[in-house]
Amino acid sequence: MKKLATAAAVAALLGASASASAWWGPGWGGPGYGSGMGDWMNDMFGDGYGDFNMSMSGGGRGYGRGNGYGRGYGYGNPYYGYGYPYYGGYGAPYGAYGAPYAFPYGAPYGAPVAPAAPAQSESK
């Protein structure tokens, strides 16, 4: 019986302390009405200010060497880009000087290939 009385006393003390520490009424000092949903937002959606800056930049640089028309293109190259010896880049009749001086269409740019040296004969 003594154990039952002790258990009842402990339960009563725990119940009283739990009730005393509970929040009775609106929390955080509220007025006691309203749902409380969104009350923490204040006037956040009233006056506002925003700023946005964006900058974008790009660039490129290149350097290349090569042949386009004959042995070069532009001032300072032999024959000023017309090739050696003055062949056009597109062929007849669209070459620099027309037929028969223009290279045929589809032929490689630049000077013609030099003929092969004759074979040496064996003489003893």
From Swiss-Prot:
The keyword Signal applies. InterPro entries: SGP. Coiled coil: none annotated. Keywords: Signal. Residues 1-22 form the signal peptide. To C.vinosum CV1 and T.roseopersicina TR0. Structural protein of the sulfur globules, which are intracellular globules that serve for sulfur storage in purple sulfur bacteria. The protein envelope of the sulfur globules is composed of the three different proteins CV1, CV2 and CV3. This is Sulfur globule protein CV2.
